[in-house]
């Protein structure tokens, strides 16, 4: 069992033996207090396995984006623990957390977040340039060919379609070879064809490179590209699905009233 919201936390594995790229242990996130208190996450424990594509789904307000943001170190828990590999994020200073996000985590958001004055190639290498890290040219070439951007590297974002811009964002996340990539509604601003292209590239990153991806989505078709889906409702994990398909996901979501 890899996900639970029961009151008995799983024992942490010995350092170095954890097969989780990331995990939450008894994670709770509370906003407000008293009559205005909202429990966005309520004692959730979940593992995200290495080299796997996991989707997080649930109705609006279920806590899925909150869970992703807390596990990615973009927000803090009210109680519980979050680990990236064997590293407990609660034990890190702000500077250490910033460095961990830079060096070990890739992000893909609904908004492309590209720098408009930079070319596609410059946007892809920007995180490494800011970190003072040398670009691995062989890996860069592999990523570019995987996301099919070779003939668009000199183009600026305004010269690219939405799908091409999101492929640049995916390439940027892959280029630094992070331990895990978090994607928050990555196809939310794309048409169906562009969405399919981006999701296919993400799937290839898992299958061919062993990349770990955790994706928040409302879309059953997008979730169907994952190896596993974790379903949230009211801050709890309420179900899981292995080897999903779009039709199976849609049927399951209907049961949740969405």
Protein language model features and the residues they cover:
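Pre-NBD coupling/linker segments of ABC/ABC-like ATPases
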Residues: 2-17
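ABC family nucleotide-binding domain
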Residues: 19-226, 232-234
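Conserved beta-strand-loop-alpha-helix hinge in the C-terminal portion
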Residues: 236-258
